[in-house]
């Protein structure tokens, strides 16, 4: 009991004798200039169009894009589709489409048809089916709701 009291007293004395340092607010410093939308699109198009890009790097680029607070432009989506086709990974291409569809959020009814309209020639050229063509846009084994009857 005495040792606990002594420790608490020592701690209180130490904090009162030692001056508290002034706290400086952290400042976030951004390096370089702000990137425009066109430069951003070109950077990712160039990333996906690199020679010798492998599946892991493609997945990393797609994951980075889908983690950002934006819907990728049709040019970037096409570049990602071509890259996944170059490494012969059609499943990756379909997942990329599904991720882009999911990024449309509550604007899915307007944005996703626009994206599909823009990338349909590329999809046909590469032979990549959409999620709707595969029938994976709705759950396969889902039961009808009792409230819909």
Curated annotation (Swiss-Prot):
First-listed, main subcellular location of the protein, grouped into a coarse class: mitochondrion
The UniProt record lists the keyword Cytoplasm: no
Keywords carried by this UniProt record: Heme, Iron, Membrane, Metal-binding, Mitochondrion, Mitochondrion inner membrane, Transit peptide
Localization per Swiss-Prot or TrEMBL: Mitochondrion inner membrane
A GO cellular component entry from the record: mitochondrial inner membrane
Pathway: Energy metabolism; oxidative phosphorylation
Membrane topology annotation: Peripheral membrane protein
GO biological process: mitochondrial electron transport, cytochrome c to oxygen; positive regulation of cell cycle
InterPro entries: Cyt_c_oxidase_su5A/6, Cyt_c_oxidase_su5A/6_sf
One Gene Ontology term of the molecular function aspect: metal ion binding
Top-level division of the source organism's lineage: Eukaryota
Family listed: Belongs to the cytochrome c oxidase subunit 5A family.
Role according to the record: Component of the cytochrome c oxidase, the last enzyme in the mitochondrial electron transport chain which drives oxidative phosphorylation. The respiratory chain contains 3 multisubunit complexes succinate dehydrogenase (complex II, CII), ubiquinol-cytochrome c oxidoreductase (cytochrome b-c1 complex, complex III, CIII) and cytochrome c oxidase (complex IV, CIV), that cooperate to transfer electrons derived from NADH and succinate to molecular oxygen, creating an electrochemical gradient over the inner membrane that drives transmembrane transport and the ATP synthase.
Quaternary data: Component of the cytochrome c oxidase (complex IV, CIV), a multisubunit enzyme composed of a catalytic core of 3 subunits and several supernumerary subunits. The complex exists as a monomer or a dimer and forms supercomplexes (SCs) in the inner mitochondrial membrane with ubiquinol-cytochrome c oxidoreductase (cytochrome b-c1 complex, complex III, CIII).
Protein name: Cytochrome c oxidase subunit 5A, mitochondrial
UniProt organism field: Drosophila melanogaster
Lineage: Eukaryota, Metazoa, Ecdysozoa, Arthropoda, Hexapoda
Name of the encoding gene: COX5A
